[in-house]
Design a protein with these regions (language model features):
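Core catalytic region of metal-dependent phosphoesterases/phosphodiesterases
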Residues: 2-94
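Conserved beta-sheet core of the metallophosphoesterase superfamily
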Residues: 84, 95-167
Length: 170
């Protein structure tokens, strides 16, 4: 099974639509959302085509395919309009690996075995088994990014060019 991994959408319908096109491109069956879905937060400028209502409509259409965790910009009201749960953390099993999904604002407190996929800082980074896939809509390292998680690897791509940004063999 392949997963499309997105984080830090921050209400941008423009970049969400582009990212969702990658479901078919890569043959992904599920979507992993790593938080900060609708609101841009007080520290970020508005992303291009900021439209939380359109983001809600688009994502709710995929509610049966989504596993999502709550980010620091996600509020209780977001959970009322999204038709899928926002978990504090989630865990999936791939082959012999455990992969924990979290937003990342508490990643320093993580001390379990296995891999961690997170966002929050908007920067692609790998530190051991901690993997940050950047941001779909408000990158801090110049790449709008998404990732594809398979049974044996995670590959992060530039959303605009499909250039491989990083690949981690699990």
């Amino acid at each position: 099974m392949k997963f499309l991994v997105l984080t830090d959408i921050h209400g941008s319908i423009k970049y969400l639509k582009m990212a969702m096109e990658k479901l078919d491109v890569h043959g992904c069956e599920k979507i992993l959302l790593l938080g900060d879905i609708l609101y841009h937060g007080p520290r970020n400028d508005l992303p291009l085509e900021y439209s939380p209502k359109e983001v809600i409509t688009l994502l709710n259409g995929y509610k049966d395919k989504i596993i999502s965790v709550k980010g620091n910009c996600d509020a209780e009201v977001d959970e009322m309009v999204l038709e899928f749960p926002l978990f504090p953390e989630a865990t999936i099993k791939l082959n012999n690996h455990t992969v924990t999904l979290m937003h990342g604002h508490h990643v320093d407190e993580y001390n379990e075995d296995g891999y961690v996929l997170y966002g929050h800082t908007h920067v692609n980074k790998v530190e051991g088994k901690l993997i940050n896939i950047g941001s779909v809509s408000i990158p801090k390292d110049s790449h709008h990014t998404y990732a594809v998680l398979s049974q044996d690897s995670l590959t992060s791509y530039d959303l605009l060019t499909d250039e491989v940004i990083m690949k981690v063999v699990l």
